[in-house]
């Protein structure tokens, strides 16, 4: 009994002791809270404090009580959560669904159905219980664009994107990422792939990207790729990938009026090549594609010698009939021309060239007209239609400038007008526009400009206050920069150039007999090796074709020395070119040329195939009544005689001319182009100065006339 009482007393004492300790603990906590509240009150902020299982909102002080509740958001929580979930997926923790990619090496990818269903609407119905995939926990992924299916690394990256929202896309993986994004309805990832491909769009991949854009309905990407293909169609059809396109895309391109092509003959050969790549499957499409060709734009000889005998044409009644109609149309046109009957312009679109068809044009650039006015207007002789057309203005006053033709541009540089003597512009035929590029390093005119291996070489020239230049400079279009090379051994003025083997530059020029004066100029012909940078005088230009023969037959005349000549490039080897150098040159090419033409100065000379053109110039250079010319002459190699062409819209001298191929869209109808703003302002300024000068002269004449009276 005593023991029981003692035990009860001990228990009561222990309970009392615990209550005391609990009260002390509470007091300590309250005291701590009061102390912390005092500190907070001093700082003027609000904190949410958690202590010993009791949450207390602490007053911030001041007259207005703080809010009773506030929201808390951890900015990194979502990203950390998605990262942890992805780590769990990679370790196979808590996964409840398996994605089976039969093509990806037979690999299976474990995942969480809740994450996949939240990431994309593709998985929401699939895993909601209505389909067998939800019950079995396996989703079979089949039917991919390629037989093996997407690479395992790409699949892993896209699944990781659904967890984390991050992915790295490369040019090698973008097509598979795009296919997976399209399959899984990952809209933002699909749009990103479209923007990525836009940045990587290039002539070498535009066909493939255009196909991808169509396949996955990326409309903006498809438009941009189509525009690149359309403007470079004549290059695109040289790529083997073009001939892997399906019928409907080939049909769409042949139906396009804007595709840039060199001729309908090329399109006919393109259709044949596409069909022959898989004749068994594609021959049934030939008739439909053949109907899209503009046979009336093909030469009659080509129709009869190449198109008509072709097996696919000869065995098809519809195709045979179309060829016969085109040949008959050509015969009727020739009969009208021979009889002098004016042919009414056709309104039938199928009989006209495609708007994107490249047409042969002799382009005339810059120069001076009557009254000494500089001409910024460019004009072109449209060879097929035997008429002159207007082309865009240049932004400079060009006189004594040089011209050079590259694969994509026409470059003009230099001028006698000091304000434009260093300026370089280039013309883009596909866009029908001029643009400025890096200026020359020296103000000059009457120099040589020619292309070698994609770079422009500027050689020699003449300055307004210099007897001439020996300098050689090179322009790199990729860097848009000029740099100096070693100078020529002598001054070279009035330079005409030919390029051989994409290395050697043959030059006909004049050099001063006395370097200290401009009097006494002698003709010189020399060869420059652009690789060794060595110079060697030669007896003549290589007599390769009519253009070379013509230049050498007039090389010592004032007509040639004051003319501008478009440079020409030849692919033959230099050894063969050297064998064509000769001391004696036949002047047979001049026999049918009117004698008065060779008395012209400041003419523009250029070539088209094996024909030669002489355009503009002036007569009576020493007389007050200088006669500016607008006549143009053409040496027809086929007929071996000179012909007088329709006159230019206005006379001009010291212009340059060159052959260029321009899309028909810029040539049909009557084109009008505005004068550039910088030249408009300068023209107004000159007019004002002339009026001031005229007024000053009138003021001086008044007293003089009064005295005479």
From Swiss-Prot:
The modification Phosphoserine is found at residue 466. Residues 95-171 form the BTB domain. SUPFAM superfamilies: Kelch motif, POZ domain. It comes from the Eukaryota. This is Kelch-like protein 11. Residues 206-308 form the BACK domain. It holds the Pfam family Kelch_1. PANTHER family: KELCH-LIKE PROTEIN 32 (PTHR45632:SF3), LD33804P (PTHR45632). The keyword Transferase does not apply. Component of a cullin-RING-based BCR (BTB-CUL3-RBX1) E3 ubiquitin-protein ligase complex that mediates the ubiquitination of target proteins, leading most often to their proteasomal degradation.
């Amino acid at each position: 009994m005593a023991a029981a009482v003692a035990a009860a007393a001990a228990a009561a004492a222990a309970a009392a002791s615990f209550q005391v300790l609990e009260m002390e603990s509470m007091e300590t906590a309250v005291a701590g809270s009061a102390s912390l509240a005092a500190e907070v009150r001093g700082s003027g902020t609000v904190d949410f404090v958690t202590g010993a299982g009791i949450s207390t909102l602490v007053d911030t002080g001041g007259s207005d009580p703080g809010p009773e509740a506030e929201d808390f958001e951890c900015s990194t929580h979502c990203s950390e959560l998605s990262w942890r979930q992805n780590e769990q997926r990679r370790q196979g923790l808590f996964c409840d669904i398996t994605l089976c990619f039969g093509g990806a090496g037979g690999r299976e990818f474990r995942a969480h159905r809740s994450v996949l269903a939240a990431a994309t609407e593709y998985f929401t119905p699939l895993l909601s219980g209505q389909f067998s995939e939800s019950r079995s926990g396996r989703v079979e992924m089949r039917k991919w664009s390629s037989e093996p299916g997407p690479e395992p690394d790409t699949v892993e990256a896209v699944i990781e994107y659904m967890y984390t929202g991050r992915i790295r896309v490369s040019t090698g993986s973008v097509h598979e990422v795009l296919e997976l994004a399209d399959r899984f309805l990952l809209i933002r990832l699909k749009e990103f792939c479209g923007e990525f491909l836009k940045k990587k769009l290039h002539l070498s991949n535009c066909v493939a990207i255009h196909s991808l854009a169509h396949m996955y309905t990326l409309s903006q990407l498809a438009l941009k790729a189509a525009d690149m293909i359309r403007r470079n169609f004549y290059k695109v059809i040289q790529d083997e990938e073009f001939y892997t396109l399906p019928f409907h895309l080939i049909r769409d391109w042949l139906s396009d009026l804007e595709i840039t092509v060199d001729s309908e003959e090329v399109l006919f050969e393109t259709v044949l090549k596409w069909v022959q790549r898989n004749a068994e499957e594609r021959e049934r499409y030939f008739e439909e594609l053949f109907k899209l060709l503009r046979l009336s734009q093909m030469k009659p000889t080509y129709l009869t010698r190449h198109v008509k005998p072709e097996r696919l044409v000869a065995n098809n009644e519809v195709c045979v009939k179309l060829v016969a109609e085109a040949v008959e149309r050509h015969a009727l046109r020739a009969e009208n021309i021979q009889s002098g009957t004016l042919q009414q312009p056709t309104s039938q679109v199928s009989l006209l060239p495609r708007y994107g068809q490249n047409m042969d044009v002799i382009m005339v650039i810059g120069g001076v007209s009557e009254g000494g006015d500089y001409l910024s207007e460019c004009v072109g002789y449209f060879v097929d239609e035997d008429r002159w057309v207007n082309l865009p203005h240049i932004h400079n006053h060009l006189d004594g400038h040089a011209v050079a033709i590259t694969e994509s541009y026409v470059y003009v540089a230099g001028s006698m007008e000091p304000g434009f003597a260093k300026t370089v512009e280039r013309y883009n035929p596909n866009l029908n526009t001029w643009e400025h590029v890096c200026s020359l390093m020296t103000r000059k005119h009457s120099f040589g400009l020619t292309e070698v291996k994609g770079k422009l070489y500027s050689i020699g020239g003449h300055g307004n206050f210099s007897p001439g230049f020996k300098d050689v400079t090179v322009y790199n279009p990729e860097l848009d920069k000029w740099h100096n090379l070693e100078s020529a051994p002598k001054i070279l003025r009035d330079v005409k150039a030919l390029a051989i083997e994409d290395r050697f530059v043959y030059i006909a020029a004049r050099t001063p007999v006395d370097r200290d004066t401009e009097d006494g100029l002698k003709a010189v012909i020399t060869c420059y090796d652009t690789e060794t940078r060595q110079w060697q005088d030669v007896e003549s230009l290589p007599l390769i074709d009519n253009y070379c023969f013509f230049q050498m037959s007039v090389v010592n005349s004032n007509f040639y020395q004051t003319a501008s000549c478009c440079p020409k490039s030849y692919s033959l080897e230099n050894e063969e070119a050297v064998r064509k150098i000769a001391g004696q040159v036949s002047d047979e090419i001049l026999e049918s040329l009117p004698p008065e033409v060779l008395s012209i100065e400041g003419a523009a000379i250029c070539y088209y195939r094996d024909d030669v053109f002489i355009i503009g110039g002036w007569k009576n250079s020493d007389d007050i009544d200088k006669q500016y010319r607008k006549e143009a002459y053409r040496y027809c190699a086929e007929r071996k005689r000179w012909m007088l062409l329709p006159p230019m819209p206005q006379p001009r001298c010291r212009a340059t001319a060159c052959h260029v191929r321009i899309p028909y869209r810029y040539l049909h109808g009557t084109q009008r182009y505005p004068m550039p703003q910088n030249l408009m302002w300068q023209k107004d300024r000159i007019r004002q100065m002339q009026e001031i000068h005229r007024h000053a002269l009138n003021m001086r004449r008044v007293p003089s006339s009064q005295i005479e009276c």
